[in-house]
A protein has these predicted regions:
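Structural signal for interior beta-strand "rungs" in well-ordered beta-sheet cores
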Residues: 55, 115-325
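Terminal amphipathic alpha-helical/low-complexity segments used for targeting or macromolecular assembly
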Residues: 1-119, 184, 190-191, 196-211, ...
Length: 355
């Protein structure tokens, strides 16, 4: 039976690696570690074997740690005393990062396979790096540029003039137009970039609304990841910008002229309306909605299902709809609960008096 973690039918495998290589990967000094051992892969605490590395980032799984058979476990220094005999503790102050590094060591991304699939349609004026991969049935438009070591999956549509930087990966069924894509950008299957923004004259004519031409672009900076079935509309007269290092979850909507700073995180089903600007390191949780023309300050956090209708100050946290600062929101919730208890108590007293 195939292992759950790193099933070789789906994931490339490397190794085995000695303990010293694993320690080097996470920046752990090799001195002081137990005897040299070979490790063949990674696995969860519950299923790991003595030849595998596991990890723990949440104390609530400490029972699984005590019972694990893993040969080594990556964990925070404060949890090292829970490691059972026979298991090596690989301590890290950033255990999630360390786990990502070790998992990537054993399961590196597959390299691009240079070449253009015979079923792909590539305009003669497109410039494609010699070591880029163009998948089956993909279409590359006129004057498009595909950078070194890019991997374009099957059934992808790359529009005229689109630029995709080196080492980027575009998943199947993605469409990209009117866009400039940076380096090391990952776009997951089904995403849509560069289509018309939702711009029209709000007063209907006898034949309906008149569309305002959307003359801007989409700019995706370096090291961005865009989730499956997410959408980024091009700007109306300026650019829609996704800042370097940002992450968009699946099913996210970014409207025209929106500008995200560096390392923003937008969680699934969130939507950001036109011309709203996010500073660096902003987090927008799942199903939150932001109206247009807002400014969200650096480091702000938007709670799940929040309805944001006004600007949000830097490093503040808001929840609810309409969104309120977290402390104010829960103060109101507590007040409403007290009022409800008083009302219920009053009903009981009235009923007792009638008896």
């Amino acid at each position: 039976m195939h292992p759950v973690a790193g099933d070789p039918r789906f994931f490339r495998r490397a190794g085995p690696f000695p303990l010293s290589r694993i320690a080097e990967t996470i920046g752990e000094p090799a001195e002081g570690l137990p005897e040299e051992r070979l490790f063949s892969g990674v696995a969860p605490l519950q299923t790991a074997s003595p030849e595998q590395v596991s990890f723990l980032t949440n104390r609530q799984y400490s029972a699984a740690l005590r019972e694990t058979r893993a040969g080594a476990v990556i964990l925070d220094p404060t949890l090292a005393h829970l490691v059972p005999a026979g298991t090596i503790a690989l301590v890290s102050k950033r255990p999630i990062l360390a786990w990502a590094q070790v998992a990537g060591l054993f399961h590196p991304l597959p390299p691009s396979t240079p070449g253009i699939h015979p079923t792909a349609v590539v305009d003669p004026s497109a410039r494609i790096a010699a070591d880029a991969e163009i998948g089956p049935l993909s279409v590359i438009g006129a004057a498009a540029e595909i950078g070194a070591r890019c991997r374009i999956g099957p059934l992808v549509s790359i529009g005229d003039g689109v630029v995709i930087g080196a080492d980027s990966r575009i998943g199947s069924h993605v469409s990209i137009s009117h866009s400039l894509i940076g380096e090391r950008v990952f776009i997951l299957p089904g995403a849509r970039l560069g289509q018309d923004g939702f711009g029209f004259d709000p007063t209907p004519t006898p034949t309906g609304f008149i569309t305002v031409p959307q003359l801007g672009r989409v700019v995706i900076e370096d090291d961005v990841e865009i989730g499956a079935n997410s959408m980024v509309d091009r700007g109306s007269a300026q650019d829609t910008v996704i800042g370097a290092g940002s992450r968009l979850d699946n099913a996210v909507q970014i409207a025209h002229n929106v500008r995200l700073g560096r390392c923003c995180v937008i969680v699934s089903q969130a939507g950001i309306s036109g011309s709203t600007t996010l500073g660096d390191y902003v987090t927008v949780a799942g199903q939150a909605g932001l109206t247009g023309h807002l400014h969200i300050g650096q480091g702000a956090r938007i709670g799940a299902q929040a309805g944001v209708m006004t600007d949000v100050a830097p490093r503040s946290s808001v929840v609810g709809s309409p969104a309120e600062p977290v402390r104010e929101f829960f103060r109101q919730v507590a007040f409403l609960r007290r009022m409800m208890r008083r009302e219920e108590a009053g009903k009981h007293e009235t009923g007792a008096g009638l008896g």
